[in-house]
C-alpha cells in the first residue's frame, strides 16, 4: 500500500469511505476546505492499482499543533496497517513543518479507535460533552512527538 497526498480526483473515494465508516455525515466540500487549510495534512492510502482505501484529513491549529479532523479506512482494510501508515506519514509531514503535537476527538464508545490511538502515543486529555451532532461526548486525545 502507498501513502500519497490527496488529489482532487480522490474526492469521490474519500466521500464514499467517510460515508461508510464515520458516524457523522459530511458534505464532499469538507475535503476541499481541509485541503485549503493545510495541503500537507491531507493524505490517502492507495493500493498498487491506485484504488483509495483510506484517508486522513487534518488542519494546522498553530505553528506547533495539528488536529486530525477526519480519519477513516475502508472496513475491508482495517487491521492491515493502513491506518498506522497514514498516521505515521502525517506525523512525518507535521514534524517537517515544526509541528510537535497532534490532537483529535473520538467517541468513547469507539473502543477500537481509542485503542488504536493509545497504541500510537495518544493520551486522553479530557471529555468534550455534546461534541457530536447527536449530542454524544468525545474524548480529546493528544500525541506529543
Residue map of PLM features:
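Short glycine/proline-centered loop/turn elements that form peptide/ligand docking sites
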Residues: 87, 110-113, 130-135
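Conserved acetyl-CoA-binding loop-helix of GNAT-fold acetyltransferases
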Residues: 79-92, 115-119
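Acetyl-CoA-dependent GNAT
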Residues: 5-76, 87-89, 93, 97, ...
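Extreme N-terminal starter segment of soluble prokaryotic enzymes
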Residues: 1-3
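Residue-level recognition of the GNAT/N-acetyltransferase active site
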Residues: 74, 78, 105-109
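Conserved catalytic-core motifs of GNAT/GCN5-like acyltransferases
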Residues: 103-105, 118, 123-140
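Conserved phosphate-binding and hydrolysis motifs of nucleotide-dependent enzymes
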Residues: 50, 54, 81-83, 121
Amino acid at each position: 500500500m502507498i501513502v500519497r497526498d490527496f488529489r482532487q480526483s480522490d474526492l469521490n473515494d474519500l466521500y464514499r469511505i467517510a460515508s461508510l465508516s464515520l458516524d457523522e455525515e459530511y458534505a464532499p466540500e469538507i475535503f476541499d476546505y481541509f485541503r485549503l487549510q493545510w495541503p500537507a495534512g491531507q493524505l490517502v492510502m492507495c493500493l498498487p492499482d491506485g484504488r483509495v482505501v483510506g484517508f486522513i484529513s487534518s488542519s494546522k491549529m498553530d505553528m506547533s499543533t495539528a488536529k486530525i479532523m477526519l480519519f477513516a479506512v475502508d472496513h475491508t482494510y482495517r487491521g492491515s496497517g493502513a491506518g498506522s501508515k497514514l498516521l505515521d506519514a502525517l506525523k512525518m509531514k507535521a514534524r517537517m513543518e515544526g509541528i510537535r503535537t497532534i490532537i483529535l476527538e473520538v467517541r468513547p464508545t469507539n473502543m477500537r479507535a481509542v485503542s488504536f490511538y493509545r497504541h500510537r502515543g495518544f493520551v486522553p486529555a479530557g471529555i468534550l460533552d455534546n461534541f457530536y451532532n447527536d449530542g454524544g461526548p468525545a474524548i480529546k486525545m493528544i500525541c506529543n512527538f
